[in-house]
A protein has these predicted regions:
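C-terminal catalytic domain of Rieske-type non-heme iron oxygenases
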Residues: 1-197
Length: 197
């Protein structure tokens, strides 16, 4: 009997995904990109936000905290929780009025119903299992990105977008709104990784 211990597999625990109906979601789109960099350079780029304001103007507009070059307010030296600050530049989450990682910030009335209001307001959650993959969860979709080294200076990323069936069946929902945004961010990261290599 092999036991499954997710804490030993994930550096960023998948607990934040407990309310996502992952088993019922459908892989709708797949995108592959080969980057001329070492897989360690890819992960180094992924795990720091110092580059965000210079490399990701659209992302830092959507997630104001990233303009401060941090992922979490607790990353700051001397940080103490402040419950009276609602500005997402200081408290985290998406900019006012945004619902998901997309071109216009809209989830197009297709937010995942099993998510709590707090989870939706947070804007995004992550789990990662180095060096193989990371998962991004958003209010209307999930993106799984596999990291596949193919040499000392080459890595392929394979991104898959998962949506609920009812979202894909909704004729008013334009999935390209989220796919185009994520591809832009990944292309920007790929360029930064290659410059760093």
């Amino acid at each position: 009997d092999a036991s499954f211990d997710e804490s030993s597999l994930f550096q960023r625990n998948p607990e934040p995904f407990k309310n996502f109906p992952i088993e019922e979601m459908i892989v709708s789109n797949v995108w592959e990109k080969t980057i001329n960099c070492n897989w360690k350079s890819f992960w180094e780029n992924f795990n720091e936000c110092l580059h965000c304001p210079n490399i990701h103007p659209e992302l830092t507009d959507l997630v104001p905290m990233f303009t401060r070059r941090i992922i979490n307010p607790a990353d700051l030296p001397g940080w103490v929780p402040k419950t009276d600050i609602s500005d997402p530049k200081f408290s985290g989450g998406l900019k006012k009025g945004a619902q998901t990682w997309s071109e216009d910030g809209s989830a197009q009335d297709c937010q995942i119903q099993s998510l709590t209001e707090e989870e939706i307001l947070k804007g995004h959650v992550y789990a990662s299992s180095w060096p193989s993959m990371f998962i991004g969860g958003y209010s209307d979709h999930i993106r799984i990105v596999r990291v596949i080294p193919s040499g000392s200076e080459k890595v392929t990323i394979l991104a898959e977008w998962l949506f609920e069936k009812k979202t894909l069946e909704n004729k008013k929902y334009n999935k390209d709104n989220v796919i185009k945004f994520a591809k832009r961010v990944m292309e920007q990261d790929a360029h930064a990784c290659e410059l760093n290599q």
